[in-house]
């Protein structure tokens, strides 16, 4: 099973549990760091996420994982909020944050830079538009490595 299929399977098993507890499954990843495997589940809600929320989801997901046993290796389960300076992984995340300030990091140089900060203005299949110093700045999406919100307190 390739990694995308593996992740999709985990999402399919996890999302209904998270939703039943009145949270949104923001993102899920399975990573290897320092020779240890981690299943990281990021949850969100309109009212924010606290430690109790993470514990509740962790208990429910852990019970399902014990029952279904979809992961054939040892791992640690981590449940957390995506945070105030959250990474935007997909179109829904970008759409939900139009008008907010973000940092866009690129794979390679573009217009003399690899990092741009500005207000998320719009996006389509080809470009992401930031408003930087009251000017629209289009960045080709294929060059984008990562987008994070910038907390403005």
Curated annotation (Swiss-Prot):
Pfam families in the cross-refs: DUF150_C (PF17384), RimP_N (PF02576)
Keyword hit for NADP: no
Keywords, in A-Z order: Cytoplasm, Ribosome biogenesis
Database matches in InterPro entries: Ribosome_maturation_RimP, RimP_C, RimP_C_sf, RimP_N, RimP_N_sf
Record keyword Cytoplasm present: yes
Location(s) in or outside the cell: Cytoplasm
Source species, domain of life: Bacteria
GO biological process annotation, one example: translation
Gene Ontology CC terms: cytosol
PANTHER family linked to this entry: RIBOSOME MATURATION FACTOR RIMP (PTHR33867:SF1)
Family named by the database record: Belongs to the RimP family.
Biological function: Required for maturation of 30S ribosomal subunits.
NCBIfam families according to UniProt: PRK00092.3-1
Protein name as annotated: Ribosome maturation factor RimP
Originating organism: Clostridium tetani (strain Massachusetts / E88)
Gene: rimP
């Amino acid at each position: 099973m390739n990694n995308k299929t593996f992740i999709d399977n985990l999402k399919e098993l996890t999302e209904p549990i998270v939703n039943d507890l009145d949270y949104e499954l923001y993102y899920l990843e399975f990573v290897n760091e320092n020779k240890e495997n981690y299943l990281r589940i990021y949850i969100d809600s309109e009212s924010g996420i606290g430690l109790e929320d993470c514990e509740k989801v962790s208990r429910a997901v852990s019970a399902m994982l014990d029952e279904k046993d979809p992961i054939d290796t040892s791992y640690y389960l981590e449940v957390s909020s995506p945070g105030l300076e959250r990474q935007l992984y997909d179109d829904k995340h970008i759409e939900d944050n139009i008008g907010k300030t973000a940092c866009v990091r690129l794979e390679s140089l573009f217009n003399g830079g690899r990092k741009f900060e500005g207000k998320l203005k719009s996006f389509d299949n080809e470009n992401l538009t930031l408003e930087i110093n009251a000017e629209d700045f289009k960045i080709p999406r294929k060059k984008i490595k990562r987008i994070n919100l910038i907390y403005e307190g």
